[in-house]
From Swiss-Prot:
Catalyzes the specific phosphorylation of the 3-hydroxyl group of shikimic acid using ATP as a cosubstrate. The lineage of its organism: Bacteria, Bacillati, Bacillota, Bacilli, Bacillales. Its EC number is 2.7.1.71. This is Shikimate kinase. Pfam families: SKI. Binds 1 Mg(2+) ion per subunit.
């Protein structure tokens, strides 16, 4: 199964640290699809890190920038790993609703906390307790659920997650 530009891209959503970038890259390599990590794309285009952008324009300013690049990437790439907060901006949330293959990667907050603690590239995780991260996570669940084609537990191996996604794409 190879996607072409006429097909809907595979879009990975979910909280920070759930494996969107890792799974997106693996999926693209296995299926010879084009892939982009939206945060990396933003950093390249803006010539700044995500934390620098947050510092300069705040979260709302960042979400507007993110939306502009999201609309660009959905037209250019087969597989897109979004930032965890892409659903926080109403325009991005509504834009994503038009796409069919949105996979919500999710895992236990303890796993997430271990993965993101002290990660300086995640401005919403810096100096946050597990309780604070959990509150942010809980505030986003309904939006992830609203647009997800399928929820995938990412507490598994990369290959198991990949197989589950491919199964949904080919059989579901």
């Amino acid at each position: 199964m190879l996607l072409n530009k006429k097909n809907s891209p595979i879009i990975l959503i979910g909280f920070m640290g759930t494996g969107k970038s890792t799974i997106g890259e693996y999926l693209s390599l296995e299926k010879q699809l084009s892939f982009i990590d939206l945060d990396v794309y933003i950093e390249i285009k803006e010539n700044k890190t995500i934390p620098e952008i947050f510092e300069e324009v705040g979260e709302i300013g960042f979400r507007k920038i993110e939306y502009n690049y999201l609309t660009e990437c959905t037209k250019k790439y087969d597989v897109i790993a979004t930032g965890g907060g892409v659903i926080e901006y109403t325009e991005s949330l509504n834009y994503l609703k038009q796409y069919k293959y949105i996979f919500w990667l999710d895992c236990d907050i303890d796993v997430i906390f271990k993965r993101v603690t002290n990660d300086k590239h995640r401005p919403n995780a810096i100096d946050k307790s597990k309780k604070q991260l959990n509150n942010l996570y809980l505030s986003r669940i309904s939006r992830y659920n609203e647009i997800a084609f399928m929820k995938v537990n990412s507490d598994k191996t990369i290959r198991e997650i990949y197989n589950e996604i491919i199964n949904y794409l080919t059989c579901g």
